[in-house]
Swiss-Prot record:
Record's function text: A humoral factor that plays a role in stress tolerance; gives increased resistance to the lethal effects of bacterial challenge and stress. Regulated by the JAK/STAT pathway and NF-KB-like Relish pathway in the fat body, upd3 in the hemocytes and Mekk1 in response to septic injury and consequent immune response.
UniProt note on tissues of expression: Expressed in the fat body (at protein level).
Induction behaviour: By stressful conditions such as bacterial infection, heat shock, mechanical pressure, dehydration, feeding with oxidative agents such as paraquat or exposure to ultraviolet light.
Keyword terms of this UniProt record: Antibiotic, Antimicrobial, Glycoprotein, Immunity, Innate immunity, Secreted, Signal
One GO CC term, this protein: extracellular space
Pfam family, one: Turandot
Domain of life according to the entry: Eukaryota
Subcellular location: Secreted
Note: Flies overexpressing TotA show prolonged survival and retain normal activity at otherwise lethal temperatures.
Family stated for the protein in its record: Belongs to the Turandot family.
Signal peptide bounds: 1-21
Name assigned to this protein: Protein Turandot A
Gene name per UniProt: TotA
Record GO biological process: cellular response to heat; cellular response to mechanical stimulus; cellular response to oxidative stress; cellular response to UV; defense response to bacterium; innate immune response; response to bacterium; response to cold
Amino acid sequence: MNSSTALMCFALLLISPLCMGYSDEDREADNLRIAEIIKNAQDDDSKINSTQELLDIYRRLYPSLTPEERESIDKFVNEHTDAIIIDGVPIQGGRKARIVGKIVSPGVKGLATGFFEELGSKLAQLFTG
């Protein structure tokens, strides 16, 4: 009985890396995608439209971050998403809700593009160390 328990534990150790939700390949793919998003987002509209994808990558990456990294980015996201107003109405649906509408007032474009650039920079730093 003791040897079968040891064998089961050994098998679980071999299988457990295959069951992880965010693999090294996923991490590398997200790293490349962040670089591509930042490189291709040249104008304000493309930056604003790409912000949600950066937030989606952050959500996938979240469980693998240290508490300090999570707190830093969460604080940044919370501060800025509370201030973003689309068509004169504040965002709704939580701190990481979709923040980009079809029409963003010109006064908010600077804030939204600054948010994109800073979030992209913070996420890129997580991958480069």
